[in-house]
Amino acid sequence: RYGYFLGCIDLTVENGQMIACQIEAIPTKDYILDLDKEDEAFIKAMREEGHRRLAQEKVANLGRKLNFNETCQLVLQAVCQETDSQLTLLNTGLIMKTLGPQVTMADLQEALPHQMRMARLFVTGQELKEICREVFTKAELLKNQAIKGMGFRGKTFGEVITGNFAYKNGNLLYNSRVVDSNEKFSLVLVDQYYFSSYFPTIKEKEVTLLFPDLLRELVAKYLRNNGAD
């Protein structure tokens, strides 16, 4: 699944019927050849050129270096505004570095390297409470777990963070008040929450996947519209 093995399947067929099947998983490290110096130099040059071009693409001047919590809050706010959603639910493992004072696309590539888009769903207060109960409970188990696949390019899941609402002691708070069970909200998440097996309550909902922007591209749009030049 992660490129560690090659799959080899040998089928024996007689008269249109399969009579034997042999399956083998072969470690890719047994087949990887050492790169020669010319290949290594080419790869390094392409990587550096890509970073140089992204670094030239100025996004915003925040005036100062943000700390980690401030960077998280910026991402939460950006996601809500750029997807026209009321609420958002993310995890700190998505944010790989802090931002500011100058922000370029190279900074956003490093801070939010994930190949993830956003998923939006409409929920009642009761449904949101069920989602939060599941996500916050699972997050305690996932907090320090290495996550791979589904576009995630970070290390661990981290902690759950919420945008425009709070989940405390089993209650939802929105605009400094307890949410009614029948209230309706638009909630936006990274698509990983929908595709993964961690959160079956989310997979059961009708979800709209938002194209074409990746997470970092939404943040770039927000900063261009709201950040100082």
Residue spans for each PLM region:
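Active-site-adjacent helix-turn-beta-strand microarchitecture at beta-sheet edges
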Residues: 1-53
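Residues that form or immediately flank small-molecule/cofactor binding pockets and catalytic motifs
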Residues: 1-2, 28, 92-94, 192
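Structured core elements
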Residues: 10-12, 22, 88, 120, ...
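Hard-cation-handling environments
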Residues: 33-110
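Feature captures C-terminal
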Residues: 74, 85, 94-229
